[in-house]
Regions:
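Hydrophobic, lipid-facing positions within transmembrane beta-strands of outer-membrane proteins
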Residues: 78-82, 128-132, 151, 190-196, ...
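Cleavable N-terminal export/targeting peptides
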Residues: 1-26
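Short loop/turn motifs that connect adjacent beta-strands in outer-membrane beta-barrel proteins
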Residues: 21-26, 91, 139-150, 202-205
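Extracellular/periplasm-exposed beta-strand and loop segments of Gram-negative cell-envelope proteins
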Residues: 38-75, 99-130, 159-189, 217-230, ...
């Protein structure tokens, strides 16, 4: 973490010797890469009282006294983003961004009652999102001339398409039932983000974009269907399970104004 902070200050400090932004630039394009950390994403039944098909977790307490579910998160992952936007006022810009998070590894623990020992859970997911964003530059709003640094605050709304492969539940403490694999699932839902960052001029047209961003990508779900079990190859029918997907991330982008 200290190394990342030092590198960020080096980037910001080096901007003192770089050109300022072009006053005439209105439109811009930007490509970014992000390093993100998932919030807790615990899977539960969509309806824990469902009977047709039955809920996977149900309503009884788990082995640790909590509601039965899969407790975990999607860990650390990378994202790619492409954006096109424009300044609608000297201090206000808007853009349309497309973000792809190609590989998110879910890892957690289940707590089914009566199962001894650990109950690891694994899955792989991905997400595509499209958002309309708005950014306010407070220094320009306050009447200061644009310099090499343009701090901003922003937010966006849009849609996210989230997909997850079948979730694998392992039961190493059981003698017969060792593994269950749920159906995969996909869902398109509303998404939003909030961000704070700064633009850094590399020339009158080229700029860096460094930002912190919180993103909520809505729900991830496994669909109702047949769950595989090693001791019952035909499996059993289960209802939908779901969680929310949110992340904290650092975004580094390179843009061009024209």
């Amino acid at each position: 973490m200290k190394k990342k902070i030092i590198c960020l200050f080096i980037i910001l400090g080096s901007a003192l010797n770089l050109p300022t932004f072009s006053h005439a630039a209105t439109w811009y394009i930007r490509g970014s890469i992000s390093g993100e950390l998932s919030r807790s994403s615990d899977f539960f039944d969509r309806d824990s009282t469902a009977t047709t098909p039955p809920a996977l977790f149900g309503t009884t307490p788990g082995s640790d006294g909590r509601s039965i579910g899969a407790y975990g998160d999607f860990g650390r992952f990378l994202g790619l983003e492409g954006s096109v936007g424009a300044y609608v006022l000297p201090w206000l810009r808007m853009d349309l961004s497309h973000n792809y998070r190609p590989h998110m590894e879910y890892s957690g623990q289940a707590n089914f009652a009566g199962v001894p020992g650990a109950q690891p859970v694994y899955a792989t997911a991905s997400s595509l999102s499209l958002m309309c964003n708005i950014f306010i530059e407070p220094m320009r709003l306050a009447g200061f001339s644009p310099g090499r640094l343009r701090p901003y605050l922003g937010g966006g709304l849009g849609l996210a398409y989230n997909r997850i492969d079948g979730m694998t539940y392992l039961f190493p403490g059981l003698k017969v039932h060792k593994i269950s694999i749920t159906p995969s699932g996909e869902k398109t839902n509303r998404a939003f983000m909030v961000t704070v960052g700064t633009l850094i001029a590399l020339s009158q047209r080229v700029f860096l974009d460094v930002a912190y961003r919180y993103t909520d990508l809505g729900r991830v779900r496994t669909e109702a269907g047949r769950m595989y079990m090693n001791n019952l190859p035909a499996g059993i029918e289960i209802s939908e399970t779901r969680t929310r997907l949110g992340s904290h991330g650092i975004f580094l982008g390179l843009g061009y104004s024209f």
